[in-house]
Curated annotation (Swiss-Prot):
An example Gene Ontology biological process: glutathione catabolic process
Alphabetical list of InterPro entries matching this protein: ChaC (IPR006840), GGCT-like (IPR013024), GGCT-like_sf (IPR036568)
Residue ranges the record marks as coiled coil: none
Active site: 127 (proton acceptor)
Binding residue positions for substrate: 49-54
Protein name per the record: Glutathione-specific gamma-glutamylcyclotransferase
Family the UniProt entry places it in: Belongs to the gamma-glutamylcyclotransferase family. ChaC subfamily.
Keywords: Lyase
The gene coding this protein: chaC
Pfam (any one): ChaC
Length: 231
């Protein structure tokens, strides 16, 4: 499980699994990306982060406020080939990102201004290890009626590990089989399902994928013990 201590001490070359050297971003590249993002800060208001995946149940951030909300214009998609963390180059899985169209519900976190760069540096180490996302300022509609500007990690379709085919029948076998140093790919999907249920949120785009992955696991692990890597 990713924790603050893990992120602070992690050697990005090894902590998440074997990452192809050509894909791995240096600390300097991450810092430049963060600086470029902050240079585009739309106003002097607080900085919010939008979590639509594991940031919802495990932010590992120091924040002053959180609120559920909706991002219009983007939807969840398992469109990132996963070769580290919960997958390997030999048996890749799929990781969550955002693609254009639709809407996404999630959790927004307001970061403290006095430690803003420290928190964002940790976040960039977590999310931008290979530069697979485009950190983008977007307007969020919070459930309490406010509209805020937030940093959102959107899939970069130019990234070498971007996968355009996100049909359930294509990606379910990958997710059901993949695992890595951070656990199984399937457990990530199920944690997402559980968090959405807990928050009273619905994402119909995940339904077919959840059904397919659970069916594959039931067929291959009838005793209920998840042993990854069956494919």
């Amino acid at each position: 499980m990713i924790t603050r201590d893990f992120l602070m001490n992690a050697d990005c070359k090894t902590a998440f699994g074997a990452i192809e050297e050509s894909l791995l971003w240096s600390a300097e590249q991450r810092a430049a990306s963060l600086a470029a993002t902050l240079a585009c800060r739309p106003d002097e208001g607080p900085v919010w982060i939008f979590g639509y995946g594991s940031l919802m149940w495990n932010p590992a951030l120091e924040f002053t406020e959180s609120c559920t909300g909706t991002l219009v214009g983007w939807h969840r998609a398992f469109c990132l080939r996963l070769t580290a963390g919960r997958g390997t180059a030999h048996q890749p899985g799929r990781m969550l990102a955002l693609k254009e169209g639709g809407r996404t519900t999630g959790v927004a976190y307001r970061l403290p201004e006095e430690t803003l760069e420290q928190e964002l540096t940790l976040l960039w180490k977590r999310e931008m290890i290979t530069g697979c996302y485009l950190p983008t300022w977007c307007q969020l509609d919070l459930d309490d009626g406010r509209t805020v500007n937030a940093i959102v990690f959107i899939m970069d379709p130019r990234h070498p590990e971007y996968e355009s085919d996100t049909r359930a029948q294509v990606i379910a076998p990958l997710i059901a089989a993949a695992s890595g140093p951070l656990g199984t790919n399937a457990q990530y999907l199920f944690s997402l399902e559980q968090e959405l249920i807990k928050l009273g949120m619905q994402d119909d785009g995940l339904n077919d994928l959840l059904v397919s992955v659970k069916k594959l696991l039931a067929e291959n692990f009838p005793d209920g013990v998840l042993r990854p890597g069956f494919a």
